[in-house]
Structures are given as structure tokens and as C-alpha cells.
Amino acid sequence: MNSNFKHQSIQKHFGVIIENDKAITNITDSTENISKGSIFFARQGMSSHGSDYIKLALNRGAILIISSKAINNKKVHYVPDLENILAGFLYDYYDIEQKKVKFFGITGTNGKTSIAYLAHKITQDHKK
């Protein structure tokens, strides 16, 4: 996928313009995956909010930070309904047709990993 499409997708969903000469290397909501050219989504986690790691993200080379929490920082783009927009953005960004994606939920105390493995194997065999 060309970089121009990625830039347009970000502008379409978040209203942010990234100069075309800035290469987007990855998108992440995990500080462990931030590198030069990353877009970091600062979201609510289990014990903290991604906005707590803005300085770290910038130090690691993030070119854009999109946060679900209002932050007084010019480098952070606030999107109050980030969770509602994010899924549509990811489908668009990775050029995935939503109708082709299937989700399965596996719950219970025991056997989840085995069932997930078997379900994956069956769906892969069915594609052939």
C-alpha cells in the first residue's frame, strides 16, 4: 500500500494532515512498538492511559499521537470518540474489506487455547 493512501486515511478519519515526506512506519497503542515514524494511539489501558507515555512516544520517534484523553500538548491530537473511530480506520488503513472479517469469541474456564487452535485450523482448511 502506498504511503499517500496511509496519509489520506489518517486525514479522513482523524482530520490530521501528515506531510507526505514523513514516512509512517507503523501504528500502535503499545509503547513497546513505538519507533521512528510511528503513530501512537494513546488509549485507556487496564491500569493506565496511553497519554501517560506521550513523552516516551515522542522520544522514541512517534510522528503523531492520537489520544482519547484531552492533553495540553500541541503534538497530541485529541479524538474524544477514538474507540468508535479506530476500528473503521484500521480497516481502511490496512485496506481490509469489513465484510470478509469473521470474529469468534471463545469463553470458559478450560480449553480456550485448544478450541482457538482447532477453529483456526478448520477455517484455514476450509479456505483451500
Regions found by a protein language model. Give the residues of each.
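Phosphate-binding loop of NTP-binding sites
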Residues: 8-11, 85-128
